[in-house]
From Swiss-Prot:
GO terms for cellular component: MICOS complex. It is found in: Mitochondrion inner membrane. Residues 117-133 have a biased composition (Pro residues). Its main location: mitochondrion. Residues 75-135, 206-299 are annotated as: Disordered. Residues 163-671 are mitochondrial intermembrane. It comes from Coccidioides posadasii (strain C735). PANTHER family: MICOS COMPLEX SUBUNIT MIC60, MITOFILIN. Residues 1-11 form a transit peptide. This is MICOS complex subunit MIC60.
């Protein structure tokens, strides 16, 4: 609006008039003659003189950079044109005339500071003072400012509405004519981006907007704890390559897209009928303008491209892209513009497929010829090789026969010599055997003699030898008892060491300020158990996360439960499918709820938290975990991590108690 009011005034103002007004303002301000020139000139300046009607010479720059003119103050022929605005306070005739200008220096200045010398003083009388402006126009200025501010506010509101959905709702609902302005801007933007859209689509029948209809948000629009499960199922389904999907076929995607386009068309056709049935009141209104028929005739859809080349993934991918383009164009109502182009492209692709098939057949034929040539050469080489092998085999057979005969004669001679040596050795062995038998008989006689002597000596010393045998038996019994007691002592020592190792694990878990790993302590317990299956089973029942990262102590569990109880109370009033409003309401209600004390009975969240805290203070972690496990909904989801830590602590404690019990059983078995 402001631009439209300023544009006509720009056309009426001539350059000469503008320069006159500027020059008169310089004269009134005492700035006449203070002209600055550039210190450097790119081209020489050629001054010209233009005579006027009154004989005044007007200097003109030769490089057409700018033109200055000096007009006498008493010239009645040159006047500034009247302003197009009829509301101006100063009449066009009251504009002061510019004073007589002095000759302007046309050559570049040579002063040090780059400024021109002041013009010589003249005896021209000063111009008359301008008439005082009339007081008034305050309401006009206020109205102009109001219109300008309102326009800026509407422009900024429309711009923010196009960028922010929240501000769009506020602007269109609470600002007068805001919705119409936003719709107009969006329609103009759509027409600018799609100038031919109005020609291709039929006019849509629009009904009156229901101003009183409330906008509702469904109950299942909030957050849900099942999102992670759906994402995990989607990931598992996406990672399974054996399932049916886009990677199995290139044509199924095109069929699915074509089916989706047809479904959208069916919905669009069914939408007007449904709208007419649901709004019977509109039947009384005058009928709207009938839909116009499309300007262009409806073209027949282009058939999908089909090339019988299944072993070329590149061709299949290209065919899939072309079929996608054909499906999109067929779905568009303005497809008649692209039918010829797509048909030509389809024909080119079919020719390309035929050329690929022909090239493959030619390459296959050439490969078959090369294979036949190679096969013939191979058979010829094989026959030649067989002939050479037969010749070499015959030569080798003759040579082997000669070597065989020579070797047979050598073996016969060696066998004869060996027989002679064997006979000689057999004779020597028989002679040695006879000598050995004689020696054995002599030894047997000596042994018999010694036994007789020993029997006689034993009979004489029977009393003394009997006492020595009893002492030997007693010493053996003492040695056996000593060995048994040593094993008992070793077992007790191992049991004590196992008990000490278990106590070390328990103290490491109870005395640590933060959870820390206890792998070394478990390794010591396992080594001291010496392969005991009960101890090994107890250690293996502990979760690897527990002994690799550590478990919290009882004080840490209680402290963490107290922090958890605050969050659970905030979510205690939330339903399963809660939205943002439910979360806010539950948070505000948790601030005014009273905290119970003691052992309360009931299934509500506050009673369960009170009983759990009492059980934790008594050291009954198992019962406390059972109480927290009975929670439902968001309360159970919030306490899931705390329950996992408590389960790990219970597993470790149960395993340690089992190991201690096994150590006590060992002691009882030894006794």
């Amino acid at each position: 609006m402001i631009r439209s009011s300023i544009a006509p005034s720009r056309q009426l103002l001539s350059p000469t008039t503008g320069r006159q007004w500027l020059q008169s303002s310089r004269v009134r301000g005492g700035l006449v003659g203070k002209k600055h020139y550039s210190r450097t000139r790119k081209a020489p300046v050629i001054s010209k003189a233009i005579p006027t009607l009154d004989g005044v010479v007007l200097p003109v720059r030769g490089n057409n950079a700018f033109t200055t003119s000096a007009i006498l103050a008493n010239d009645s022929h040159v006047r500034s044109p009247p302003s197009p605005s009829s509301e101006s306070a100063i009449a066009p005739e009251g504009v002061p005339r510019p004073p007589q200008s002095h000759p302007v220096q046309t050559s570049p200045g040579s002063s040090v500071d780059g400024r021109a010398q002041p013009p010589p003083e003249t005896n021209t009388p000063p111009p008359p003072p301008p008439p005082a402006p009339k007081k008034g126009g305050r309401f006009r200025r206020f109205l102009i400012y109001l219109i300008f501010t309102t326009g800026l506010a509407y422009a900024g509101g429309i711009w923010l509405s196009l960028t922010s959905d929240n501000f769009h709702d506020f602007f269109t609902e609470y600002v007068p004519y805001g919705e119409e302005a936003v719709l107009y801007v969006e329609e103009q933007d759509f027409r600018r981006r799609f100038p031919n859209a109005a020609r291709q689509i039929t006019r849509r029948v629009t009904g009156p907007r229901e101003e009183g209809q409330n906008v509702t948000i469904p109950g299942k629009s909030g957050l849900s704890w099942k999102v992670s499960e759906e994402e995990s199922e989607a990931k598992e389904a996406g990672s399974d390559v054996s399932r049916k999907g886009k990677h199995m076929s290139a044509t199924e995607v095109n069929k699915e897209k074509t089916a989706a386009v047809e479904q959208v068309k069916a919905k669009k056709e069914a939408a007007p009928a449904i709208k007419k049935e649901t709004t019977p009141a509109e039947s009384k209104k005058p009928a709207l303008e009938e839909a116009r028929s499309p300007a262009l005739p409806t073209a027949s859809p282009v058939q999908p491209l089909s090339i019988a080349i299944e072993d070329e993934p590149t061709v299949q991918e290209l065919m899939r892209i072309v079929n996608d383009l054909i499906s999109v164009v067929n779905a568009d109502e303005s497809s008649s513009r692209f039918t010829s182009t797509l048909s030509k492209a389809k024909a080119d692709f079919e020719k390309l497929g035929e050329r690929i098939i022909a090239a493959k057949q030619e390459s296959y034929k050439f490969a078959q010829e090369e294979i036949e040539k190679a096969r013939a050469d191979m058979e010829k080489s094989a026959n030649e090789l067989i002939r050479r092998i037969d010749e070499v085999r015959a030569d080798d057979a003759a040579q082997f026969r000669e070597e065989y005969e020579a070797e047979r004669e050598r073996l016969a001679r060696a066998y004869q010599e060996k027989i002679k040596i064997e006979l000689q050795r057999v004779q020597e062995v028989s002679e040695q055997r006879l000598r050995n038998e004689l020696v054995e008989q002599a030894i047997e006689l000596n042994r018999k003699f010694l036994s007789d002597v020993r029997s006689l000596v034993e009979n004489e010393r029977e009393g003394r030898l009997s006492k020595l045998s009893e002492l030997t038996a007693n010493v053996g019994e003492l040695e056996r008892l000593t060995a048994e007691w040593n094993s008992v002592v070793d077992t007790n020592l191992t049991t004590q060491q196992l008990q000490v190792a278990v106590d070390a694990v328990r103290s490491a878990l109870e005395n640590s300020d933060i959870p820390r790993p206890f792998i070394n302590e478990l390794v010591a317990v396992k080594e001291l158990a010496a392969g005991d299956p009960v101890v090994d089973a107890a250690i293996s029942s502990i979760s690897p996360v527990a002994y690799q990262r550590g478990i919290p102590s009882s004080a840490q569990i209680i402290e963490r439960f107290r922090r958890l109880a605050t969050e659970v109370r905030k979510a205690s009033l939330l339903p399963e499918n809660a939205g943002i409003a439910s979360h806010a309401a539950s948070y505000m209600m948790s601030k005014v709820m009273f905290k119970k004390q003691g052992s309360e009975e009931g299934d509500d969240v506050e009673s369960i938290l009170t009983r759990t805290e009492t059980l934790l203070e008594e050291g009954r972690l198992d019962d406390a975990a059972r109480e927290m496990n009975s929670l439902q909904g968001w309360s159970k989801i919030l306490s899931k991590d705390w329950l996992a830590d408590v389960r790990r602590v219970l597993e470790v404690n149960q395993a340690l108690e089992l190991i201690e019990t096994e150590a006590r059983l060992r002691c009882l078995q030894v006794e």
